[in-house]
C-alpha cells in the first residue's frame, strides 16, 4: 500500500492493524537521525564501550571512559575513529549544513587513521540520498612521519611517529567502509 497525502499535503505512512503512524517526512527525519547516531556511536566505540588502545597495549584492563571517548582523548582499541563523539557530531552537522544549503563539492579527509570520519561523511551522504558527491580519503597509510623541528618548531619532541598503531593500510580503511555497506 502506498503512502497517501494528508490534509496538509504531507505524505502519511498508512496505518497497519490499527497502529497510529506519523507523517512520512517526520518519520524519515527520525530514522535518518537514529541511523547517523548509531553510525557515530559505532565508529567511536561508544556503542560497545571499546576500551582505549593504551590499556590493551599496556596489558591493563581499565574500564571504558565515556568522557574521554566523547572528547577524543583516547585511542580506541578497535573502533574506527579517534576524534571522539563531539567532533564526530560536529562533522555530521557540517556535512548536513552544506547538503541542506546546496553547497557544491566533494568531501575529503586528510590523515584518516582507520577511516571513521570519512565513513561518517559517506553515511551522511547515504542518509540524505546524495549521489552526486564523493568522499575522498588522503593518507600515506604508513603512520606519522618523524617531526621536522627545524621547519615546525612546535613539533619538537612529538614522538607519535613511533606508534605502529597509527599506520593503517588502505585495505583496512576500505574494509571499514565495507563493514558499514558504504564502500563505493
Where are each of the predicted segments found?
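Extreme N-terminal basic, low-complexity initiation segments
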Residues: 2-8
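S-adenosylmethionine/decaboxylated-SAM
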Residues: 23-36, 42-85, 101-184
